[in-house]
Amino acid sequence: MSLQSQVSGRLAQLRAAGQLLVSLRPWPGRSAGGPRPRGSACGPLVALGEHGYCAWLSAGVGAWGAAGRGAWVRTWAPLAMAAKVDLSTSTDWKEAKSFLKGLSDKQREEHYFCKDFIKLKKIPTWKETAKGLAVKVEDPKYKKDKQLNEKISLYRGDITKLEVDAIVNAANSSLLGGGGVDGCIHRAAGSLLTDECRTLQNCETGKAKITCGYRLPAKYVIHTVGPIAVGQPTASQAAELRSCYLSSLDLLLEHRLRSVAFPCISTGVFGYPNEEAAEVVLASLREWLEQHKDKVDRLIICVFLEKDEGIYRERLPHYFPVA
């Protein structure tokens, strides 16, 4: 069933509920006890749309009295549960993407694959994290900048649970999912993500492409392909890794997004040494933020391994000094 058909069906159910409850709640634009608008009893519902009608109907529950509240529980609550749109394989990805873009942040929550998602405000900035660390560096690579220290975060955890504007996927060139964080993101977002990725026709190393986040708390997924390093990385591979981050940030600006979380790109099975990768990442993010700090709220370095967390805690003060 298409998304349009699903929503049309929900509206039909809501209209039926409205006919039952119309005597219990004033219509929009009608004072309590005033005459009902002429014409179809459900005419105003069409103009309100599904979410507008939901808000209007819910707002009036307290004014209905015991009888009205009882009718609401028996009739409206089951219909509200039924109004959840299915983001399974039966839905076209284009329709699902359009539908999700029209929702508020609160409305999107019912479509998340998880309930224990992490809001941006719960992720400490580097300025906050560094307070509890011995992070003084004698000769940092860059000057102290309090504003930049509030724009960068180090977070250890599951990137798929972050409620940010975008998360970055360390993808392979096919963009169709794989191992590691790539597979985790595809499983959490659902099959519609793979459906959209099929239309992107691969991605070159160092480049990035963007899709909807679907069932993820993140609104978008930025897919980038890192270099495969065998042994010590070459200058060309370092440039490609840097390009992964900068290309992703270009898309962030292009789509007017303000928060993004990066995984460790090219480390692990792609063979890029963790320490060398961290140097490339931190230099790239620092230099980019110096140019665009007013256009973003947060850049998050999201690590999964304790080893990577230790590397970034040790290297961050060299690029984002706090003392």
Swiss-Prot record:
What's the top EC group for this one? hydrolase
Please tell me where substrate binds in this chain.
157-159, 170-172, 177-182, 265-271, 304
* TM helices/strands, residue ranges: none
Alphabetic keyword roster: Acetylation, DNA damage, Hydrolase, Isopeptide bond, Nucleus, Ubl conjugation
Partners and quaternary state?
Answer: Interacts with ESR1; Interacts in a manner that is estrogen independent but is enhanced by estrogen. Interacts (via macro domain) with AR.
Which top-level group of life is the source organism from?
Eukaryota
Matches recorded under Pfam families: Macro
Q: What is this protein called?
A: ADP-ribose glycohydrolase MACROD1
InterPro entries per the UniProt record, alphabetical: Macro_dom, Macro_dom-like
